[in-house]
Curated annotation (Swiss-Prot):
It catalyses: uridine(38/39/40) in tRNA = pseudouridine(38/39/40) in tRNA. GO terms for molecular function: RNA binding; tRNA pseudouridine(38-40) synthase activity. The keyword Isomerase applies. Its EC number is 5.4.99.12. The gene is truA. This is tRNA pseudouridine synthase A. Formation of pseudouridine at positions 38, 39 and 40 in the anticodon stem and loop of transfer RNAs. It comes from Pseudoalteromonas translucida (strain TAC 125).
Length: 264
């Protein structure tokens, strides 16, 4: 039996999603709990591997098991075993040809900036604090230049191992809700650090260090060194993964926290 799980996690105390030797990872915690539920070793495959400090409200994984278990064992049962900063949001039997990574048609991220002169005392693990005022109108104006199919070499990590930098951004927007500035981005797939590098550039535009059209110039340059510094991990969330309807993967509230669901 193949099962898909929806996973939510606060990545602050983890060295990323992927299991690694001698460090704490989200994958390790989920696999350990699943192995106890199934009474055999379980390996999971995720939709997208997030970096150290990055969070998830819409991560999707799959695993195989022959253990006769009701789905409630993989939701309520798992949540009794997992640490409080990881939770299962749904469990769903799926077809054998479903693959959490390769069946995905799009991923969606949100980046949350607490834009206030003074730092806050709550939620500080889940947002990036930035004390200079950001012009979200200019940031939103810049978004148009990245929507579409382009070579995103200027926005990939130097050590990114992807074979091609061609990606298609389907949606990119910037909104302000009080002291919070939210960047919402959806693409067929992302390069390593792509969202955080785009965020860093948008923040410089929000500071009026660059004009919105600068993003188009960066696309044409195809040179990472010409772009802004990578934004911090703390404000980034994987909030949704799209799959073909045939797999019937449940949709859960995007979040994080107070942010409304917006169909795009």
């Amino acid at each position: 039996m193949r099962v898909a799980l929806g996973v939510e996690y606060n990545g602050a105390r983890y060295s990323g999603w992927q299991r690694q030797s001698h460090v704490n990872s989200v994958q390790q915690e989920v696999e350990t709990a699943l192995s106890r539920i199934c009474n055999h070793p379980v390996a999971i495959v995720c939709a997208g591997r997030t970096d150290a400090g990055v969070h998830g409200t819409g991560q999707v994984v799959h695993f195989d098991t022959d253990a006769p278990r009701d789905m409630v064992a993989f939701t309520l049962g798992m949540n009794t075993l997992l640490p409080k900063d990881i939770a299962i949001r749904f469990a769903q039997p799926v077809a054998d040809d479903f693959h959490a990574r390769f069946s995905a048609t799009a991923r969606r991220y949100r980046y949350v900036i607490y834009n206030n002169p003074l730092r806050g005392a709550v939620l500080n693990e889940g947002v990036t604090h930035f004390h200079h005022t950001l012009d979200e109108t200019k940031m939103q104006e810049a978004c148009q230049y990245l929507i579409g199919k382009y070579d995103f070499t200027s926005f990939r990590a130097i050590h990114c191992q992807a074979n091609t930098a061609i990606r298609t951004i389907q949606h990119l927007s910037v909104q302000r809700q009080g002291s919070y500035v939210i960047i919402d981005i959806k693409a067929n797939a992302f390069l390593h650090h792509m969202v955080r590098n785009i965020t860093g550039c948008l923040m410089d535009i929000g500071l009026h260090k660059q004009q919105p059209v600068w993003l188009k110039e960066l696309l044409d340059l195809k040179e990472r060194a010409k772009a802004s510094a990578t934004a911090k991990a703390a404000g980034l969330y994987l909030v949704d993964v799209d799959y073909p309807e045939q797999f019937n993967i449940p949709k859960t509230p995007l979040g994080p926290l107070f942010l409304p669901d917006i169909s795009i």
